[in-house]
């Protein structure tokens, strides 16, 4: 998976000047909670940024006052067939998947099946880390907040084992580079380890648990996992990379094979409509349409800052109080507290930015590789919603 630093660098920027650009647009769902000029401004921004950053297709959801006010598809999910993006088109959401794993663990806390601060070896007795002291000390909280002391993503082998068990066996080969609980080090495989613990506790795969206890209650009927889920979906986005000479080049599906084992950290596939409902769950203290998915107490814990993120992650001067929570980043931008995450895998980018105090949020998904597109759109559209 690709690093998450660029999202943080973008959050402090100013609103883009908006202008219209001609491109295919597929409108599926629009509420009238916002005025027509606001929708026009959103369209203009999306289309301009898609043109600027060579994006084939994108999907957008806007949330205001606790309700979805706009869901829309732009451009093409497949350039070869000119198939348009709709609000039902599946995109890989990358590291936003980490918050789903954290939510699953939170549900088990509600059911008294697990404790965030109990050493994870209690749930995975065969676990071995390179330092025996860390083996006995690392907790689920530390795995979900990237504070386990295990090294950051860039220090792990590029080759991902094909199974979750293989990933877990590989932990013993990695050095402990910080005292558990002391330092933020963004570690995707640590979230996979938390998901593996969940599997041992509930006696089923992380995928089966997530579908039953998160997807089904949220009505995420088409959401899936990894490469297999995307390949089998009729309304899926083809991933692209931009080449200065050849234009938009399809990325072979084989490049996403690693997502199956790493699904708890970056392999969920979903539509913008489904992620919009997931955003509503976050903004309504664990409730959606009158159904409680997780307790309000645990939803607050998921969003509570756990560890300050280092200065090397903060390039935008307007960002304050940058922290990682449990599956989420948090920050204060111009006096507004944000809960957010981005996602990045080959041919896909995603962003979800929430302002809980205003019950507002933005979801942007794309089948291109421009972080500037997803993050710029999310930031600027949230500014509009908060005016």
Language-model-detected regions and their locations in the chain:
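N-terminal Sec-pathway targeting helices
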Residues: 9-19
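Active-site helix/loop module of the DD-peptidase/beta-lactamase fold
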Residues: 43, 57, 87, 92-96, ...
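Catalytic nucleophile serine of serine hydrolases
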Residues: 95-96, 185-188
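Short, conserved catalytic-motif segment at the N-terminal edge
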Residues: 38-91, 113-115, 122, 130, ...
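Bacterial N-terminal signal peptides
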Residues: 17-31
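The feature captures the short pre-catalytic strand/loop hairpin that immediately precedes
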Residues: 165-177, 245-260
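Active/ligand-binding-proximal structured segments within catalytic/core domains
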Residues: 101
């Amino acid at each position: 998976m690709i690093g998450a630093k660029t999202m943080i660098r973008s959050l402090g920027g100013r609103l883009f000047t908006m202008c219209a650009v001609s491109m295919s647009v597929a409108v599926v769902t629009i509420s009238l909670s916002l005025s027509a000029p606001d929708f026009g401004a959103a369209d203009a921004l999306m289309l301009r940024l898609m043109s600027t950053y060579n994006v084939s297709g994108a999907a957008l959801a806007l949330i205001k006052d606790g309700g979805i006010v706009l869901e829309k598809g732009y451009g093409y999910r497949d350039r070869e067939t000119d198939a348009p993006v709709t609000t039902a088109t599946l995109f890989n959401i990358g590291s936003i998947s980490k918050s789903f794993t954290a939510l699953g663990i939170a549900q088990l806390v509600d059911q008294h099946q697990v404790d965030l601060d109990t050493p994870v070896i209690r749930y995975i007795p065969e676990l071995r880390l390179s330092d025996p002291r860390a083996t006995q000390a690392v907790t689920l909280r530390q795995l979900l907040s990237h504070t386990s002391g295990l090294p950051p993503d860039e220090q792990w082998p590029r080759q991902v084992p094909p199974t979750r068990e293989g990933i877990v066996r590989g932990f013993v080969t990695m050095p402990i580079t910080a005292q558990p609980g002391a330092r933020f080090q963004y570690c995707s495989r640590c979230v996979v380890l938390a998901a593996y613990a969940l599997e041992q506790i509930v006696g089923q795969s992380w995928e089966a648990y997530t579908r039953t206890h998160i997807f089904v209650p949220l009505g995420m009927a088409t959401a899936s996992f990894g490469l297999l889920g995307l390949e089998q979906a009729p309304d899926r986005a083809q991933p692209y990379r931009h080449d200065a000479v050849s234009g938009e080049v399809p990325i072979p599906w084989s490049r996403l094979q690693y997502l199956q084992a790493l699904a708890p950290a970056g392999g969920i596939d979903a539509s913008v409509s489904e992620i919009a409902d997931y955003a509503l769950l976050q903004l309504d203290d664990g409730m959606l349409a009158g159904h409680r998915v997780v307790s309000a107490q645990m939803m607050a814990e998921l969003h509570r800052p756990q560890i300050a993120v280092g200065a090397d992650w903060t390039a935008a001067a307007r960002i304050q109080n940058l922290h990682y929570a449990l599956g989420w980043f948090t920050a204060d931008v111009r006096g507004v507290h944000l809960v957010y995450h981005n996602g990045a895998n080959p041919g896909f980018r995603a962003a979800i930015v929430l302002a809980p105090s205003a019950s507002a949020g933005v979801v942007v998904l794309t089948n291109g590789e421009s972080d500037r597109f997803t993050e710029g759109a999310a930031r600027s559209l949230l500014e509009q919603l908060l005016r």
